[in-house]
């Protein structure tokens, strides 16, 4: 049975679903003010694997991933770029979709935008006001009253005296409590983006946006709510508080959070100017290499980025593709592959242990290489299973020859020379000119190319 670490209880818990095997999953998406970076890649590739795995188990999954298309950062960036917030957010959403498509991240079943949910947001704020969980600040903003929700802080475990400390209103004129946060921000100037509401022209606060979109998609039942660990507090803490205060029957069974990305021993952040954009990384590495690298660390652990580790992921993925070379991997697998499948699913059932799952794929590839020499039918059965299990992780989806040749670091003229030499060597072998055939093999070896002869073809691979 699948067990998931729940950020709320801090325990691994069994995923329990209804008789129809339906699962509702909501993941906080991007704020569309800049290009996506490797932190986005880590989070959304991981939840893409969750989607693929749950569906492979036969669950009827509904996956919703929102887009924040109005926000302080979006407004600031649009003013800096001298473009409308709509133009900026649409441009960044388009770039996100290009990046995610390149990384083979499956699109969600629904991708709601904040600006499409303003009426629902206003309705939910009104409910919070009527229930005395919110108040109108002296500047006209609508604030959530943290002290009205006794369980505040339980999700993130970030308790502090300051959360319940009444403060001097002259210092924080919009708040009764320093932890209170905005549900609705009233327009303060002509450049302020806003919508009409019972409280005047304004726009929603960040946290109420997700509460609204969650409830619109799933009502009161969410099985999995995910996002990066940087969202745990205050965003997810505040989101949960609002949602429960709107309706006490609201529940989220499992909270899941991906770990931080560390670059040069520092947390990756825009303030430190050390972000690595996905689009830049995709110009240097195949998308499957990036996926392999990001899945090589357990999703809850910090991921330490360095190019050496990316290169190592490239070598390991090439090993998997090399084992698929020269076999019929579309053949149906039989009993001999059951042990690998069992081990793979056991790893994934243990809180999505993708590093262990990848190691099982590498073990399977060694078995394929062994049977290539003694039993081609068994090799094909194993290769079929490798391809199938790899697809759950979003890898091994390409033609092996295409992948291996396109990830060999040289230009087309050198690849052409390699293929030409292999052709000349094949001609020499057909007329039993072994001296010439061996000379060409040595010439290719000097280029860093190793040949692999099979009964029906000759393949090459790089020593890089």
From Swiss-Prot:
It catalyses: tRNA(Cys) + L-cysteine + ATP = L-cysteinyl-tRNA(Cys) + AMP + diphosphate. Its cofactor is Zn(2+). It is found in: Cytoplasm. The keyword Translocase does not apply. ATP binds at residue 270. Zn(2+) binds at residues 28, 210, 235, 239. A motif ('KMSKS' region) lies at residues 267-271. One of its GO terms (biological process) is cysteinyl-tRNA aminoacylation. Its EC number is 6.1.1.16. It is an enzyme of class 6 (ligase). One of its GO terms (cellular component) is cytosol. A motif ('HIGH' region) lies at residues 30-40. Pfam families: CysS_C, DALR_2, tRNA-synt_1e. Keywords: Aminoacyl-tRNA synthetase, ATP-binding, Cytoplasm, Ligase, Metal-binding, Nucleotide-binding, Protein biosynthesis, Zinc. Belongs to the class-I aminoacyl-tRNA synthetase family. NCBIfam families: cysS. HAMAP family: Cys_tRNA_synth. This is Cysteine--tRNA ligase. The lineage of its organism: Bacteria, Pseudomonadati, Pseudomonadota, Gammaproteobacteria, Enterobacterales.
């Amino acid at each position: 049975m699948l067990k998931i670490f729940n950020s709320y209880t801090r325990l691994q818990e069994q995923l329990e679903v209804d008789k129809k095997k339906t699962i509702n999953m909501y993941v906080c998406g991007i704020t569309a003010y800049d290009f996506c970076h490797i932190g986005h890649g880590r989070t959304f590739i991981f939840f893409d694997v969750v989607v693929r795995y749950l569906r492979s188990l036969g669950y009827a999954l509904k996956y919703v991933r929102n887009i924040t298309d109005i926000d302080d950062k979006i407004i600031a960036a649009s003013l800096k770029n001298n473009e409308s917030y709509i133009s900026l957010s649409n441009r960044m959403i388009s770039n996100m979709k290009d990046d995610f498509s390149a990384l083979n991240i499956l699109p969600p079943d629904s991708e709601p935008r904040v600006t499409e949910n303003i009426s629902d947001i206003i309705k939910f704020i009104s409910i919070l006001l009527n229930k005395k969980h919110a108040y109108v600040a002296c500047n006209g903003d609508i604030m959530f009253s943290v002290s009205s929700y006794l369980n505040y802080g339980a999700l993130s475990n970030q308790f502090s005296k300051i959360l319940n400390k009444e403060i001097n209103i002259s210092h924080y004129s919009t708040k009764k409590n320093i932890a209170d946060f905005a549900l609705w921000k009233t327009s303060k100037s002509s450049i302020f983006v806003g919508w009409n509401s019972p409280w005047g022209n304004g726009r929603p606060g960040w946290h109420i946006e997700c509460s609204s979109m969650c409830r619109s998609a799933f009502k009161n039942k969410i099985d999995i709510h995910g996002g990066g660990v940087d969202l745990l507090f205050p965003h997810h803490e505040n989101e949960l508080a609002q949602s429960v205060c709107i309706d006490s029957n609201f529940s989220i069974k499992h909270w899941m959070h991906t770990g931080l990305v560390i670059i040069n021993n520092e947390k990756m952040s825009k303030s430190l100017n050390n972000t690595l954009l996905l689009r830049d990384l995709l110009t240097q590495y195949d998308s499957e290499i990036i996926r392999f690298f990001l899945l090589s660390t357990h999703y809850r652990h910090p991921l330490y980025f360095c190019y050496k580790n990316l290169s190592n992921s490239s070598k390991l993925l090439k090993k998997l593709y090399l084992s698929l070379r020269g076999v019929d991997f579309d053949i149906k697998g039989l009993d001999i592959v059951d042990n690998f499948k069992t081990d793979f699913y056991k790893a994934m059932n243990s809180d999505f242990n993708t590093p262990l799952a990848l190691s099982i794929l590498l073990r399977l590839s060694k078995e394929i290489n062994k049977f290539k020499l003694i039993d081609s039918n068994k090799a094909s059965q194993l290769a079929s299973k490798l391809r199938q299990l790899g697809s759950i992780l979003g890898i091994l989806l390409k033609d092996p020859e295409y992948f291996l040749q396109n990830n060999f670091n040289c230009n087309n003229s050198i690849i052409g020379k390699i293929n030409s030499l292999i052709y000349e060597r094949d001609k020499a072998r057909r007329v039993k000119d072994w001296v010439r055939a061996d000379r060409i093999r040595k010439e290719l070896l000097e280029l860093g190319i190793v040949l692999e002869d099979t009964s029906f073809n000759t393949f090459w691979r790089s020593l890089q």
